[in-house]
C-alpha cells in the first residue's frame, strides 16, 4: 500500500522567528539555515523543510511525528531524503520564486 502526502506553501509567508525555527527544524537544519546569507534563501529553506514535513505528516496520518525530530538531508544527487522508523519514503521538492511544493510517497 502506498500513501501520498502533498503540501504547497507560499515562500513569503514564512517568518524567520526563533520559536518557529525551533519548533519545525531539527538542530542540523537550524544550523544550515543560519549559514544562509540572504533572507530570501532562508525563507526558501524554511518553506522547503516545512512543506516536506507537512507532506510526510499527511502521508503518515497515524504516526506521532514531531517536526523538530525529523531531519531532512540531501543524497549525493541533491534529492531530499529522510529516515523515519522502517518506512521507505520517497520525497520530491520543487519551487519557483513564490511557492514550494513537496510530495512524500510512503511505500
Where are these regions (language model features)?
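Core catalytic alpha/beta fold that binds nucleotide/phospho-ligands
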Residues: 1-107
Amino acid at each position: 500500500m502506498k500513501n501520498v502526502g502533498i503540501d504547497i506553501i507560499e515562500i513569503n509567508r514564512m517568518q524567520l522567528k526563533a520559536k518557529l525555527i525551533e519548533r519545525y527544524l531539527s538542530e542540523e537544519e537550524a544550523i544550515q539555515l543560519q549559514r544562509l546569507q540572504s533572507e530570501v534563501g532562508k525563507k526558501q529553506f524554511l518553506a522547503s523543510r516545512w512543506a516536506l514535513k507537512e507532506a510526510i505528516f499527511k502521508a503518515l496520518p497515524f504516526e506521532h511525528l514531531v517536526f523538530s525530530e525529523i531531519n531532512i538531508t540531501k543524497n549525493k544527487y541533491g534529492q531530499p531524503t529522510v529516515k523515519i522508523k522502517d518506512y521507505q519514503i520517497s520525497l520530491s521538492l520543487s519551487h519557483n520564486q513564490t511557492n514550494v511544493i513537496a510530495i512524500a510517497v510512503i511505500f
